[in-house]
Design a protein with these regions (language model features):
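A short, polar/charged loop-to-alpha-helix boundary motif
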Residues: 219-241
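Short, surface-exposed basic-aromatic patches at helix termini and helix-loop junctions that form
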Residues: 40-43, 63-69
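Thiol/selenol-based redox catalytic cores and closely related redox-interacting motifs
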Residues: 77-220
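Short acidic, S/G/P-rich loop/turn micro-motifs used as interaction or catalytic elements
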Residues: 22-26, 57, 220-221
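Thiol-based oxidoreductase modules, predominantly thioredoxin-like and allied folds used
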Residues: 44-59, 71-79
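Residues lining hydrophobic/aromatic ligand-binding pockets adjacent to catalytic sites
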Residues: 47, 200, 229
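N-terminal targeting signals for export/organelle localization
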Residues: 1, 236-248
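Short active-site neighborhood of thiol/selenol oxidoreductases, capturing the structured segment around
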Residues: 4-42, 48-52
Length: 248
């Protein structure tokens, strides 16, 4: 990071600091997708968003092009220094003699994807396939789904799996598949150093005075929110805090 993280945050009533894993991680891409979905309800005067992800400048450029996340709000660092300072979960750290640091990281990542040292990951993976009546519809009927191994198709296809009032079966899994294809197709851009593949992130919401209103530390892969059905539900703290300030 070459500029202050909180630069130009002075006029915002709240500051949301997102410490992301690798920019090519499932969690980073999915978190950015949710933020873009809610962007109109999160004007900069209401909440200043700053994200720090593991990668390079090239990683950050590709990430923003793909997700639509604002480049001005994204900071990248190559070695997870902030993650270590905040004591965020570094992931499973099984070591086997004879393996390089990179190969150790890959082994631990695969084990975490299988649920070892990563509580809730398998449950969250299955939720993406079976649907979730507590989550909103994710793909609009007229949206064209591209970037997966499947031929392009319209979002209305998911009507076959259920009504539009909630997350239908395979809907979230499709978004995750699209993210996976994007990352694997540009692996060395997104992940210039595989030593930090298992590093997890965290979420921190502050008011304008610097008081911490909410925090979440990721316990594992696909654990970037306390409520994965509604990952941004914690932003209700902003409304509650605004009412409190108004009554003061």
């Amino acid at each position: 990071m070459t500029r202050p993280l909180l630069e130009n945050c002075e006029t915002a009533s709240h500051i949301l600091i997102l410490v992301w894993p690798q920019l090519g991680d499932f969690d980073s891409l999915e978190y950015a997708w949710w933020l873009q979905r809610k962007a109109k309800k999160l004007p900069p005067e209401k909440v200043a968003i700053r994200a720090v992800g593991i990668g390079s400048r090239t990683s950050g450029t590709r990430f923003c092009q793909y997700t639509g996340f604002s480049p001005e709000n994204l900071f990248v660092e190559p070695n997870a220094e902030l993650h270590h300072q905040l004591k965020l979960y570094s992931g499973l750290n099984l070591t086997l003699p004879g393996l390089s640091v990179s190969h150790q990281a890959w082994l631990n990542l695969m084990l975490m994807c299988a649920g070892f040292g990563s509580p809730g990951t398998l449950r969250e993976v299955f939720r993406g396939y079976r649907g979730d009546r507590q989550a909103p519809q994710l793909i609009e009927d007229d949206e064209i789904i591209q970037g997966t191994p499947l031929p392009a198709f319209k979002g209305s296809f998911f009507r076959l799996a259920g009504p539009n009032s909630f997350q239908r079966p395979f809907e979230l899994a499709t978004l995750r598949l699209r993210n996976m294809v994007e990352v694997l197709s540009n692996w060395h851009t997104y992940v210039p150093n595989s030593a930090y593949l298992t590093q997890r992130g965290g979420t921190f919401l502050f008011d304008s005075k610097g008081q911490l209103l909410y925090s979440h530390q990721d316990p594992g892969i696909l654990g970037f929110a306390a409520n994965m059905s509604q990952p941004l539900s914690f932003l209700s703290f902003i409304e509650a805090n605004s009412f409190t300030m108004g009554d003061a």
